[in-house]
Structure formats: structure tokens, C-alpha cells
Amino acid sequence: MPYRSTEILSPGPADKAPLHRVTLTHDQRHLRRKLLHLENDDVVMLDLKEAVMLADGDLLALEGGGYIEVKAAEEALYEIRPRDRLHLIELAWHLGNRHLAAAIDEGRILIVRDPVIRAMLEGLGATVNEAVEPFHPLRGAYHGTGHHHHGHGHDPHHG
């Protein structure tokens, strides 16, 4: 019989040691109701009231007690290196303008591999290398609402 979870907890004290783990890509971590396959081949039915974006280390609280830890899977990414700090801002702007998920550090940006975007970035003077690591992009401005609203076409001042 599968486990069932209807509650997500942020990583906490050691007294919440997980029974098992589930490893998910960035896209797989955005969900509401799904049967998840654990690393030990058990399954857990995640059944939430609304869609969430799970983070690495989050805990799925199991009915009847216990926790399942969420781990971010390693993914095929591009590591983008700018010439300098101002160039990093310019590159981040171009990626944001295309609504791409991005993890931004002080000296690099990570995105999911896309050859068209790679060519654009190299054309803008960036150094782009392949990387394989967990992907933790920034959460968007609309993250807390459970759904995504842009308002495109509704704001006469939107560019």
C-alpha cells in the first residue's frame, strides 16, 4: 500500500529524519497531485490542495507519521559566465525577457540546456559550458500565489 502525503514541511530539526527520499528534476518538483516513486521503489501519493514548487530538502509529511525528503535531481544545464558584473546583469535581463528559469549566482547563471539560447548568449559575449548539477532557479514574483499571472495585454504600460 502506498504512502500518502497532504502536507509539505520545510527542512527542519534532526527529529524529522526522513524515512525515504524522492529525487525530482526542477520541472517535476512543481506539482499538486501525483504518485511519486521513491528511491527504495516504494510510492507516495502526494495530494495537495494547490500546486506547489517543492524545494531541495522539503519534507512530505506522511499520514500516520514519518517524512519523505525531496532531493533535487542533477540536470543537464548550461553554465553561463559573463565578462563582468554588468554583463551578468545584461545576460540575466535577456533570459528573464524570455521567461526562462535561471539560477543566478554572483559569477554565473545556470539554465536548462537549449541550443538556440546558447547561441544567443554566445552572440552576446558570454562563455557557455555544459554542466550537470541540481537546478535551483529563482522563484518568480508570482510564486506565492500557487499559479502564474502575467497580466500581459491588461496593462497599457507593459512594454
From Swiss-Prot:
Family annotation (Gene3D superfamilies): Urease metallochaperone UreE, N-terminal domain, UreE, C-terminal domain
GO cellular component assignments: cytoplasm
Annotated segments matching region Disordered: 140-159
A GO molecular function held by the record: nickel cation binding
A biological process from GO: protein folding
Source organism superkingdom: Bacteria
UniProt entry keywords in alphabetical sequence: Chaperone, Cytoplasm, Nickel
Keyword Cytoplasm found: yes
InterPro entries linked: UreE (IPR012406), UreE_C_dom (IPR007864), UreE_N (IPR004029), UreE_N_sf (IPR036118)
Record's subcellular location: Cytoplasm
Function recorded in the entry: Involved in urease metallocenter assembly. Binds nickel. Probably functions as a nickel donor during metallocenter assembly.
UniProt family annotation: Belongs to the UreE family.
Name of the molecule in the record: Urease accessory protein UreE
The species this protein was found in: Sinorhizobium fredii (strain NBRC 101917 / NGR234)
The encoding gene: ureE
